[in-house]
């Protein structure tokens, strides 16, 4: 088939935040769609979603036959992917999975479209391609050009992750708690371990035996797999912040070869998917609300030499976690698939 041949698409989790954004981006980018089948749980079956100005009826995933589907996007949680993604792949669909279920399986590629698109070809082993964690993804879009030029040995990163990373319930919790506090009412935390409104929580996902959280360890495991370099040391701290959309990261790297902040800035200005916002003035840096929300690029600012290490650099990295952190990358993978692989 040619790249312009319309494809049959299944969208698992079509009623969720990532699923809705996937539908929007497929339409925005004129992806060649012959038929789009939105799928969800029995509870959501029968509802409608919008795609390119048309209302599509959501079908029940449990009894859907994937025969004839070319690409199946999965964005409904790990348990759903575990049960249904292999079934879709066995029927001949290429699965692009937005959960963590398959990221650490050796023969399933973990892909950031700007960083390791060559890995997509490895999908033939299992018929599944994994989308990375949103925080890993935006970090590596920015760091990969520097790694190729100077070799990154160590990454220290603190993330500032919006509540949309916890789904609709996270958005609702922040809105509800903020309204309550502004009305001088007491707040009992519901979605997060402590109240999220006007607060910072240094805890995302389950604690591991080594004291790190699973969210933090995802950044370790995924960075090494995507860059195909097990020697890279990654030291993360993941923090939930009272922002609706957009993740930010304070990143410090140590490189094998010396690279100056000026040279790194030039590399990043030429890097696909990156927009440099790095002016030494008030407001001359990217932020989630002003730059990232609702947009596609990974924004990088505060690029500066580390005054404490001869081969160190500091960067500030911001992106929309629902768009580039999940939905956009999945669509970019699909675009590469239809251009050259299926």
Residue ranges of predicted features:
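A glycine-rich, Thr/Ser-enriched phosphate-binding loop motif common to dinucleotide/cofactor-binding enzymes
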Residues: 127-138, 211-220, 325-329
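N-terminal Rossmann-like NAD(P) cofactor-binding subdomain of oxidoreductases
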Residues: 1-196, 231-233, 266, 284, ...
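A broad structural signal for alpha-helix termini and local helix breaks/kinks
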Residues: 150, 227-228, 255, 272
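Helix-loop-beta segment of a Rossmann-like dinucleotide-binding subdomain
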Residues: 123-130, 199-210, 315-317
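Oxyanion-binding "anion nests"
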Residues: 197-244
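A short glycine-/small-residue-rich loop at the edge of a beta-strand within enzyme catalytic domains
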Residues: 13, 187, 191, 207-214, ...
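C-terminal active-site/capping subdomain that shapes the small-molecule cofactor and substrate pocket
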Residues: 233-342
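Short acidic/glycine-rich loop or secondary-structure boundary segments that cap or lie
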Residues: 165-168, 208-211, 243-246, 261-262
């Amino acid at each position: 088939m040619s790249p312009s041949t319309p494809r049959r698409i299944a969208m698992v989790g079509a009623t969720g935040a990532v699923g809705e954004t996937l539908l929007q981006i497929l339409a925005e980018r004129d992806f060649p769609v012959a038929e789009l089948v939105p799928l969800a749980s029995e509870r959501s079956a029968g509802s409608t979603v919008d795609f390119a100005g048309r209302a599509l009826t959501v079908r029940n995933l449990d009894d859907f036959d994937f025969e004839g589907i070319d690409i199946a996007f999965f964005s409904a949680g790990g348990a759903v992917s575990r049960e249904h993604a292999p079934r879709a792949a066995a029927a001949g669909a290429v699965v692009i999975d937005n959960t963590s279920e398959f990221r650490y399986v050796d023969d399933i590629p973990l892909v950031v479209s700007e960083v390791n698109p060559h890995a997509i070809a490895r999908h033939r082993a299992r018929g599944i391609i994994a989308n990375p964690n949103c925080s890993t993804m935006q970090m590596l879009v920015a760091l990969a050009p520097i790694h190729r030029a100077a070799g990154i040995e160590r990454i220290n990163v603190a993330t500032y992750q919006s509540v949309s990373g916890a789904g609709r319930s996270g958005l609702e919790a922040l809105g509800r708690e903020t309204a309550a506090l502004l009305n001088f009412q007491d707040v009992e935390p519901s979605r997060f371990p402590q109240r999220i409104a006007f607060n910072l929580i240094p805890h995302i996902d389950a604690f591991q035996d080594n004291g790190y959280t699973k969210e933090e360890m995802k950044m370790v495991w995924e960075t090494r797999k995507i860059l195909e370099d097990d020697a890279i040391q990654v030291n993360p701290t993941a923090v939930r912040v009272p922002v609706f959309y957009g993740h930010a990261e304070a990143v410090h790297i140590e490189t094998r070869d010396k690279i100056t902040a000026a040279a790194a800035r030039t590399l990043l200005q030429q890097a696909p998917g990156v927009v440099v916002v790095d002016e030494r003035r008030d407001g001359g840096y990217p932020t989630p609300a002003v730059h990232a929300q609702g947009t596609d690029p990974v924004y990088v600012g505060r690029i500066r030499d580390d005054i404490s290490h001869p081969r160190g650099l500091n960067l500030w990295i911001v992106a929309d976690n629902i768009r580039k952190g999940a939905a956009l990358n999945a669509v970019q993978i699909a675009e590469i698939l239809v251009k050259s692989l299926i």
